[in-house]
Structure formats: structure tokens, C-alpha cells
């Protein structure tokens, strides 16, 4: 997992509440167990007019030229609700998104995102609305998410603070997933195992 320190990028708006994991990555694309290759199916039922994915929906923001290359998604409350499929953050990350900004997230999606290096940022509804308005008004303008400083900077330069658990922040800053976190304590684990009584080893 790559460390997340700060990221500046183009933001794309999905101005909907209760975006669920079946909308993020529909169930027919869940047969893979590796993390790659899901980006093409992200928001499939919204991005395409046909089941095969051959006819892009020109009205969906991710298909609009002004949002090409977007790496930050801004949405409304309860993002990532629904089933607990880890494929949802996989699809978002595989598409190239680095951070999701919303007033609230479903708890399981929030944890899955952090575990997969995708930063979920909680701002107030008013702050999210301001960022959306600025992104809409200023095509090509960037948003900055700074995990070190715990701030989001809007296209106009407004700075908003956000909170995240220190353990999650540490893992993201250092690029540590569950395996990486275990390996980081490898010496302590080895020392503990070496000192186990023979009957417990």
C-alpha cells in the first residue's frame, strides 16, 4: 500500500446521498478476488446506457471531459452504504481515486477504504456543498487533501479541517495495511514466539 501524505487533484462530483456499494460496483462484477481490474466497472449502471458497457452515459459526471483524470470524489451523506463488499474501495482506487469527501460514510465502507489506502474524509454538509459549488463553477480546479495537516483546501483556497482516528492516520501515512502493520511488529512477534514455553509453542 502506498503512503498517503497529501494529494492535490481534480475533483468529480456525485451529488447523491446513500450511494451504496451495489451502485459503486454491481454484483455481476464481483467474481474476481484480486484488487485490480474493477475500475472499468465503477458505477457501471450509471456510467453506461447498456449492460455491456459499450455506450457511455454522456450525462454522468465521470464520463464528462471536464472530469477526466479526476482523483478526488465529492459526494453526499452515507456514502458506501449497503453490503460490506470490499470490492467497492477496490473499484474506486483502481479507477484512480485517492480520496472521497462526504458528510458521512457507512461504517464498514469507511474501514475498508482505510485498509485499502483510500482516504475517506468527513466534512460538514455546508463544507461539502461549498466544495461542490466551487468545483462546478471552476472547471479544472484542484482540491487538496492533506492527511498530515488534516485539512482540505477547496479550489478557492478555503481550508477545512477534518478528523480521523490516529491509528488510521498512522497506517495511511506509512502505507500500512493489515499485513504491513503485522510486519512492522515482526521483531516483537519473533521475540515473543522465541520466549514461549515449550508446551505453548
UniProtKB/Swiss-Prot annotation:
GO cellular component: 3-isopropylmalate dehydratase complex
Pathway the protein acts in: Amino-acid biosynthesis; L-leucine biosynthesis; L-leucine from 3-methyl-2-oxobutanoate: step 2/4
Keyword 4Fe-4S carried by entry: no
InterPro entries (alphabetical): 3-IsopropMal_deHydase_ssu, Aconitase/3IPM_dehydase_swvl, AconitaseA/IPMdHydase_ssu_swvl, IPMI_Swivel, LeuD
Any GO molecular function: 3-isopropylmalate dehydratase activity
Reaction(s) catalysed by this chain's protein: (2R,3S)-3-isopropylmalate = (2S)-2-isopropylmalate
UniProt keyword Amino-acid biosynthesis present: yes
GO biological process: L-leucine biosynthetic process
Record's keyword terms, sorted: Amino-acid biosynthesis, Branched-chain amino acid biosynthesis, Leucine biosynthesis, Lyase
Assembly and oligomerization: Heterodimer of LeuC and LeuD.
General function of this protein: Catalyzes the isomerization between 2-isopropylmalate and 3-isopropylmalate, via the formation of 2-isopropylmaleate.
Family annotation (NCBIfam families): leuD, PRK01641.1
Similarity comment text for this entry: Belongs to the LeuD family. LeuD type 1 subfamily.
Protein name, per record: 3-isopropylmalate dehydratase small subunit
Upper classification of the organism: Bacteria, Pseudomonadati, Pseudomonadota, Gammaproteobacteria, Alteromonadales
Amino acid at each position: 500500500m502506498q503512503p498517503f501524505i497529501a494529494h492535490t487533484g481534480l475533483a468529480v462530483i456525485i451529488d447523491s446521498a446513500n450511494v451504496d456499494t451495489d451502485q459503486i460496483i454491481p454484483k455481476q462484477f464481483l467474481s474476481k478476488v484480486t484488487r485490480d481490474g474493477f475500475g472499468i466497472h465503477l458505477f457501471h449502471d450509471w456510467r453506461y446506457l447498456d449492460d455491456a458497457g459499450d455506450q457511455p452515459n454522456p450525462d454522468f459526471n465521470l464520463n464528462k471531459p471536464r472530469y477526466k483524470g479526476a482523483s478526488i470524489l465529492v459526494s453526499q451523506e452515507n456514502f458506501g452504504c449497503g453490503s460490506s463488499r470490499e470490492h467497492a474501495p477496490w473499484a474506486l482506487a483502481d479507477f484512480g481515486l485517492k480520496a472521497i469527501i462526504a458528510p458521512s460514510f457507512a461504517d464498514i465502507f469507511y474501514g475498508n477504504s482505510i485498509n485499502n489506502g483510500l482516504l475517506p474524509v468527513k466534512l460538514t454538509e455546508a463544507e461539502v456543498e461549498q466544495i461542490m459549488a466551487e468545483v462546478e463553477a471552476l472547471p479544472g480546479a484542484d482540491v487538496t487533501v492533506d492527511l498530515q495537516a488534516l485539512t482540505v483546501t477547496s479550489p478557492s483556497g478555503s481550508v477545512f479541517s477534518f478528523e480521523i482516528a490516529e491509528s488510521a492516520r498512522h497506517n495511511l501515512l506509512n502505507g500500512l495495511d493489515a499485513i504491513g502493520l503485522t510486519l512492522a511488529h515482526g521483531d516483537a512477534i519473533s521475540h515473543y514466539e522465541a520466549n514461549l514455553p515449550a508446551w505453548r509453542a
